[in-house]
Amino acid sequence: MVDWSTCPAQDSPARDAWLLSHIQAGEGEATLQEITVEANGHLGRFYVFAEPLKLGGVRINASAALQQQIADALGCVFLTPRLADLVFANRSVTLPPMPRPITSSTAAMIEQSDKVGAAVPPGASGIVDTEGKYWVLVKSLFSASAKAARKAANYGWHFEGSSFQGLKGEPTVSLPGVRVIQGVGTVHNDQHTDYSQIVRLVSRTCEVDGQQRDLADVLMDPDLAPLVSHEGPLPGWRQPDVTEAPPTTTVTPGGGEETPTTTAPASSGGSSLARKAAGGVALFSALFLLGRALARLLGDLCWTGAIPASVVNDGYKTNK
C-alpha cells in the first residue's frame, strides 16, 4: 500500500529514497507493450511501458540518476530518442503535451499525473502518448566532458503539426511530420527532475530475428543498434556513473491487461514470446540479468553517493 502522505513534499534525496524503496519492493505499476521494428535486415521486438511508471496511481517524476536505479531494479533500460519516437508511432491513445509553470514539488507531481490521467479515456488500452518527457540514451552522454559534468539527456513531448501553443519545437529524430517540444538536450545533469520528467522504460529482454536478446547488447552492436538508435551503436547502455545494482523484480515481455511490474503480463492476446515467458523464459531472464549485474558489481569503482536535490530547470522550452 502506497501512502503518498508520507512522501517528502519536495524533490530531495529523501524523496528519491522513498520512491526507490517502493519500486524495489515491487509496488510499481506498468504494462509492457510490444513494438516491432525492422532495420539492417533485422526484425526486432521490444517491450516498452504502455504508460509511464506509476506508484499508487501517480505517474512519478525522477532524475536521470534515480531513473537508472529504477531501471536496474526492474531489469529495464532507458529509451533512446528512436525508441521514444516508436512509442509515439505505436500509440493507441493520443494526448497533447500539458506544460505548466516549472516545479518539482510532490504536490505538482500528483496534480500533473491527475491532469494527464483525466485525459485518458476510460478503458483505454495499448500505448498512451504523449504524457511527458523522457531521460534518454545518446552518444554524447559518454564523452569525457559529459561524464565529468554528470550530464543527462532528455527528449519528448511529441506533437503533430508545425507548432504547439506557439512553440515550434524541433523535428523528431526519425518520424517525418512529427515534432517534439523537447529536442535532444543535455542542459541538465543527472540530478535534475521536474513535473515533466516521467519514467517510461523498455525491458532489457527483447527478441531479434526470433532469438531472445539482451537490449544492453543490442544497443552497442554495430549491426543491430539501428533497430533502436538513430545514432547507431552507443558506447554504453546505462546512464553513466550510476552504480549498477541487480534487479529486485523482473519485467518480462508481453502485453494485455495492466499488471504490476513484478509479474509477467498474462494475456492470450499477447505475443508468442509473452505466452512462453510464463515459464522458462521468465526464470532465464531473471537469472541472466542478475548474473550480469553481479559480475559488473565485482569491478565497479563508480561513484556511490546519495542523489542530491535537482538543479534549477529552465522550463518546458526546448533545452540545448
Language-model segments: residues:
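Conserved hydrophobic ligand-interaction patch in extracellular adhesion modules
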Residues: 64-131, 201
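C-terminal membrane-anchoring or membrane-association module
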Residues: 287-320
